[in-house]
Structure formats: C-alpha cells, structure tokens
Amino acid sequence: MLELNFSQQLGDLHLQVATDLPAQGITAIFGLSGAGKTSLINVIGGLTRPQQGRVILNGRVLVDAEKNIYLPPEKRRVGYVFQDARLFPHYRVRGNLQYGMAASMRGQFDAIVGLLGIEPLLNRFPFTLSGGEKQRVAIGRALLTAPELLLMDEPLASLDLPRKRELLPYLERLAQDVNTPILYVSHSMDEILRLADQVVVMDAGKVRAVGGLEEVWASSALRPWLQREEPSSILRVSVIGHHDRYAMTALALGDQRLWVGKLDAAEGNSMRIRINAADVSLALQPPHSSSIRNILPVKVAECLDVDGQVDVKLAIGEQWLWARITPWARDELGLKPGQWVYAQIKSVSFNRQNGPVPD
C-alpha cells in the first residue's frame, strides 16, 4: 500500500494529495500538462520534498515532514524511468543494466532481459539504440534494482508513433509478468486504456478521482477529456468458451453472456472490452428476430443531454454501459432512472488481455 498525505508549493502550483494507492498492478496518473503528475511522483521518488505531510510505502516511512524524515532516493527502494532514458553513454547495455543491480536480482537478470527483448542489445552502446530500445534498457535497469515500486514518467512521450507501438507490448507484458507495482504518468488516453488497472485523475495539483479504470472511465471525472471523443464504456469480462459451430467466443459480463468474433484465448482468461456508445441501441422489448447477437437486459441509471444527443448510463451487473441516442428516442421510449430496457450491442473492441481469472 502506498499512503500519500502531503502538500507542496511549487511556484503557482499547490500540490495537495491525500489518497491511498494499491501496491499492485499499473496505476496511471492522468491529467493535462501542469496538473501535477510529475510533481507527485517526484515526491514519492525523493527528488523533491513536500513542506507538509507523509509518504508511506508498505509500512515504511519515506517522508514525514513534521519529524523531518526524508529518506534519500537510494534508500527508498523506488525505481524511476524518465521520459528520456538517461543511460550511461560510456557503458554498454550490459553495464547499464548491471549498474546498481541488487544482489537479489542477479538470478533474474536473464529473465528481465528476455522479458524486455533486449538480449541482442547487451553489447551495444546507447548511442546505437533507437528511442524505444533505450527505454526498454532503462526499464530493465530500474527493475534490476529490486524496487518495491516503479515510477514511470511518460516513458513514451519522446518517442515517435512507430517506437511507441514497439514499446507498448513490452509494457503490457510488464503488467502481467512482473510483480512490481507501477505508477505510470501519462496524458495519453490510449496508453491508459491499454495499460492501466487503476487511474488517478489530477487537475491543478489535486486528485479529482481515484479508482479502477472501468469505474473512473464511467464517472464524470474524465468527461472534460472525453468531450471531443465519442463516449464509450470499458468493461471487464472473462472467456466462457467458444461456439462449437460458429467462429464465435462467449464472454461473461457479470451473469450475462456476450458473443464476439472468435478469440485466441483460453477459457477463464480475463480481458477488458471497449464499447462505443453509438454502437448501443435501446429497446423496451427484446426483438424476436435480429442479426444482433448481443441483446442484454440493463437498468437505466441516468440520462444526460450532451450537444443535442442523449447519453444514457446503464447498469449491467456491477458495471456501467453507455448508450448514445437521440432526444426523440429517449422521449418515445419514456426513459427514466430505474427503468429496465434491452441494450443491443453492435460492436466490441478489445483493450488488454490477462491470464486466467483467479477463483
């Protein structure tokens, strides 16, 4: 558990944070430039000192301003990956990886190198590497210090699109294969959708929302960032099985079943799906014959008027599904909170696939 309760004045920015974050998975720190994202992780990493408050990691006090406790960065067991890789130019990749390597990680050197796909780079100097390769080496170096927490400050920000696409799969593998919690600073919605388990939304130095990706995505906290995008839903599902006749896979969405095109995924695997609100239509009764395979009972939670359209928030088990319809359709259906209707889902996309769901 990472316990944060501190304040810091940085020029015009007043950083004020009071929240607890889980010591597992990837937690995205999201917000516009100047929101305080990097300032937050700099306090955790020991690069700056807050004027008030405490920072506690897994029961260890990293900061207690009242007692004048500021643990030095090298004693915090916190790894840091910057926007620029900051490799030692006079060391080969192997030397960079071994610099600061914890004795307990010597036996895992080959595994980390393999995970990040940097074995072919071990004898090369940093100036011969691409931006994506440098960042993979920087991540490996940070992991080999045996950190209890890994901080990543927009590691893709300085990369062009091809290099971002090159690095993202490795970050996804980190989320699945490395048991080190990661705080991942980003202002990219696409990165958050692919990588994050939890999300912290920051604005003007303050935490505006904290929670699981699906929960925060469905809330109003991200609405200012989503105004230019088509609204959508992020849902967590698991594989039930595959159709014995058609190339279709059944997914469990709460206690309901969702059919999608056949996936190369084993029964029990969990994943996140994204459904655009425009791909969800509503009906008061289930149609008797339809080409749409997914027609699910849902409960209306609220209706929001947005730019001449109506966004309908629907409860489906313990998760939320958005539909975008016209005011005419809302009035004709007589939609109101608490009403049961049928959601017809026309299209589904996928964000991230994980291993089997634990019992």
From Swiss-Prot:
Q: Where is the Mop domain?
A: 289-354
Highest taxon in the source lineage:
Bacteria
Q: Which GO terms describe its cellular component?
A: plasma membrane
Q: What is its EC number?
A: 7.3.2.5
Keyword line: ATP-binding, Cell inner membrane, Cell membrane, Membrane, Molybdenum, Nucleotide-binding, Translocase, Transport
Question: According to its record, how does it sit in the membrane?
Answer: Peripheral membrane protein
Residues in ABC transporter domain copies: 1-229
What family does the Swiss-Prot or TrEMBL record give for this protein?
Belongs to the ABC transporter superfamily. Molybdate importer (TC 3.A.1.8) family.
Q: Subunit composition?
A: The complex is composed of two ATP-binding proteins (ModC), two transmembrane proteins (ModB) and a solute-binding protein (ModA).
Q: Which NCBIfam families match?
A: modC_ABC (TIGR02142), Mop (TIGR00638), PRK11144.1 (NF008355)
Functional description taken from the UniProt entry: Part of the ABC transporter complex ModABC involved in molybdenum import. Responsible for energy coupling to the transport system.
Protein name as annotated: Molybdenum import ATP-binding protein ModC
Q: Which organism is it from?
A: Yersinia pestis
